[in-house]
Amino acid sequence: MNPKYKPLFEPFTFKSGVTINNRIAVAPMTHYASNEDGTISEAELDYIIPRSKEMGMVITACANVTPDGKAFPGQPAIHDDSNIPGLKKLAQAIQAQGAKAVVQIHHGGIECPSELVPQQDVVGPSDVFDNGKQIARALTEEEVENIVKAFGEATRRAIEAGFDGVEIHGANGYLIQQFYSPKTNQRTDRWGGSDEKRLAFPLAIVDEVKKAASEHAKGAFLVGYRLSPEEPETPGLTMTETYTLVDALGDKELDYLHISLMDVNSKARRGADPTRTRMDLLNERVGNKVPLIAVGSIHSADDALAVIENGIPLVAMGREILVDPNWTVKVKEGREKQIETVIKGTDKEKYHLPEPLWQAIVNTQGWVPYKD
């Protein structure tokens, strides 16, 4: 190994007591590869195994905690005990490569396509209309409480399946973020109507997940939370609301906050100094309370090292690990110059990508670097 990259390979111990071998994580990525019923497929295992080698931690594709939370075809499910045997295979496949296995738990809310949810009954914090037609309905208070409980039950299943932790998916415009955002939450009950009330749902889920972890986990079990710091729309989340959120999450004894960005160096847009990066601002705000994971357009070993040298303790990669599953192996062996940055259509087999994910990469220009 090139000695300058040693900081990437130092172990890290979370508050919960879970220790990872290095500072590098696989970011959660949708792969469209689970079986239709949400159980884990062989294609999914074939995809995850090479990407787990020499990783500190692997965060899985998001798994829906209720049937009406399914946001993608081929999404893994964690809403029923019948999901546990497949999830156990997934956890073991990751752990056999030496990485800690973390399952991301999720509800898509109004982002769920109607054809994927029972009775095409799409739900969210508030009613949603498109050209006068209702396309999603507001959850009742009882339904909100049941979804909170479902996150706890999903955590129990993750523990029974042998995972080392869960990541609460509070990012990317899905249900948890929908409840916090003034754009999507127009409720006037205890789940909305003010900044404080809009915060109630994310915090209730954190409390429920932490409670399930303390009740069911026999050893160390980590709980992380992923968030998106800003929304482009007005009304929408700005850095001001994000500060309020991370302040509250920072008091919850979480193992980490995973800051979901397309570019780790992107600067604040509203509610904070626009000359500074969101990562710097958030690390300054809560980094002394809870470790942050940085993600977004990190490709080279130098990109990853720059994150660590900037005071962020953990780095995750998504698209780059689709392109080069052996990224960490190469850096560890001093072969960082051999890291690949583009998927070649002529070498399809070597990438171990499930067919639906391969098609998404080929057909979505500008998402993952690709050439025929």
From Swiss-Prot:
Write down the EC number: 1.-.-.-
Q: Which CDD domains match?
A: OYE_like_4_FMN
Keyword Oxidoreductase carried by entry: yes
Keywords from UniProt, A to Z, are: FAD, Flavoprotein, NAD, Oxidoreductase
Q: Could you confirm whether the keyword 4Fe-4S appears in this record?
A: no
Q: List the Gene Ontology MF annotations in alphabetical order.
A: FMN binding; oxidoreductase activity
Question: Which top-level enzyme class is recorded in the Swiss-Prot or TrEMBL entry?
Answer: oxidoreductase
Pfam families for the chain: Oxidored_FMN (PF00724)
The superkingdom listed in its UniProt entry is Bacteria
> Which PANTHER family would you find in this protein's record?
BINDING OXIDOREDUCTASE, PUTATIVE (AFU_ORTHOLOGUE AFUA_2G08260)-RELATED
Give the family per the record.
Belongs to the NADH:flavin oxidoreductase/NADH oxidase family.
Q: What is this protein called?
A: Probable NADH-dependent flavin oxidoreductase YqiG
Q: Which organism is it from?
A: Bacillus subtilis (strain 168)
